[in-house]
C-alpha cells in the first residue's frame, strides 16, 4: 500500500518519534462563509486539528482509546486485548477511576493506523526515558501507546494528596519501553520540565501534567505554621519528592485538560466546520 498525499501544503508531520507521527493541519480549508473568520483566526493562533499516525508492523503494534480509530490501511486487525471475564472486570474498574475507556483495542498486522482528529496538542513521550517506574499522567490524557507499554492504575499513598491535592485518588501509570501519544490542552513548549535529584518540588495548585511514578506526592502547608500560611496567602501546596521528572503547566490548571477540549467537543467542532465531522 502506498499513500500519495498524506502530506501536502495543508497537512504536514509536525513531530515524529519512532513509528508514531503527529499530522497537523495548517488551516481548515473546508469551511462555510458562516465560520470562515473563526477558522482563520484559529489557524493563526495554532488552534489546529491534529491526528496521530502510527506505523504498524510485526515489531510494532499499538493500543489506543476505544473509538479513536479513524481509518487504517493494509493488513491491520483490531483485537480486544481482553483475556477473560476477570480481565474485563479489572479493565472496567481501571477505566471508571481514571476516566479512560474500559477496553482499549490493540491493533496488529502490517500497515498504517490513523486516529480521529483532535484540537488538543499531542505529546509524544518515550516512556523508557522515564525510568523503570514509568510516568503517571493526568486523567483523560491517554490517546495511544506502543503495545510494549504497560498501563496500570496507581492510587495515592495518603488521603491528603487525594482529597486536598486536586489530582484525584487514582491516576494512570505507563511503564515499559515504547512511545505514548498524550492529549494536552496546551502546547508542549509551554510545559516546564523539572528534574529532581533527591529533591522536592512545591506547586501551588494542580498544575502537574505528568510525573515520574516513583515520586512521593503529598499535600502540605506552604509554611510551617497555620499563621504563616494565612499571612503568606498561599495555604496548601502539592509537594513532589524524590528523584525523577515533573512536567507542569504554568498557564492553565490541568483539571481543564479533559473537561474543556474532550473528544466529544473536538468532534462537535469538527462537525460544525464540515471537516472530518461525525
Question: Locations of the language-model features?
Answer:
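Composition-driven recognition of glycine/serine/threonine/acidic- and proline-rich low-complexity segments
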Residues: 1-278
Amino acid at each position: 500500500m502506498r499513500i500519495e498525499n498524506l502530506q501536502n501544503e495543508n497537512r504536514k508531520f509536525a513531530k515524529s518519534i519512532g513509528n508514531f507521527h503527529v499530522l497537523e493541519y495548517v488551516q481548515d480549508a473546508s469551511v462555510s462563509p458562516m465560520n470562515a473568520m473563526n477558522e482563520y483566526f484559529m489557524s493563526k493562533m495554532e488552534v489546529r486539528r491534529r491526528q496521530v499516525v502510527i506505523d504498524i508492523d510485526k515489531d510494532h503494534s499499538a493500543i489506543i482509546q476505544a473509538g479513536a480509530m479513524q481509518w487504517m490501511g493494509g493488513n491491520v486487525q483490531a483485537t480486544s486485548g481482553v483475556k477473560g471475564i476477570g480481565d474485563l472486570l479489572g479493565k472496567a474498574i481501571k477505566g471508571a477511576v481514571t476516566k479512560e475507556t474500559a477496553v482499549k483495542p490493540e491493533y496488529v498486522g502490517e500497515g498504517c493506523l490513523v486516529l480521529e482528529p483532535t484540537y488538543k496538542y499531542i505529546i509524544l513521550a518515550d516512556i523508557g526515558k522515564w525510568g523503570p517506574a514509568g510516568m503517571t499522567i493526568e486523567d483523560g490524557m491517554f490517546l495511544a501507546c506502543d503495545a510494549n507499554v504497560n498501563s496500570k492504575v496507581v492510587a495515592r499513598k495518603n488521603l491528603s494528596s487525594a482529597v486536598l491535592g486536586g489530582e484525584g485518588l487514582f491516576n494512570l501509570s505507563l511503564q515499559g519501553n515504547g512511545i505514548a501519544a498524550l492529549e494536552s490542552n496546551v502546547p508542549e513548549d509551554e510545559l516546564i520540565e523539572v528534574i529532581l535529584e533527591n529533591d522536592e518540588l512545591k506547586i501551588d495548585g494542580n498544575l502537574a501534567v505528568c510525573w515520574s511514578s516513583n515520586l512521593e506526592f503529598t499535600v502540605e502547608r506552604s509554611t510551617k505554621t497555620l499563621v504563616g500560611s494565612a499571612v503568606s496567602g498561599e495555604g496548601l501546596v502539592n509537594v513532589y519528592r524524590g528523584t525523577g521528572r515533573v512536567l507542569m503547566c504554568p498557564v492553565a490548571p490541568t483539571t481543564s485538560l479533559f473537561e474543556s477540549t474532550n473528544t466529544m467537543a473536538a468532534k462537535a467542532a469538527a462537525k460544525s466546520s464540515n471537516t472530518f465531522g461525525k
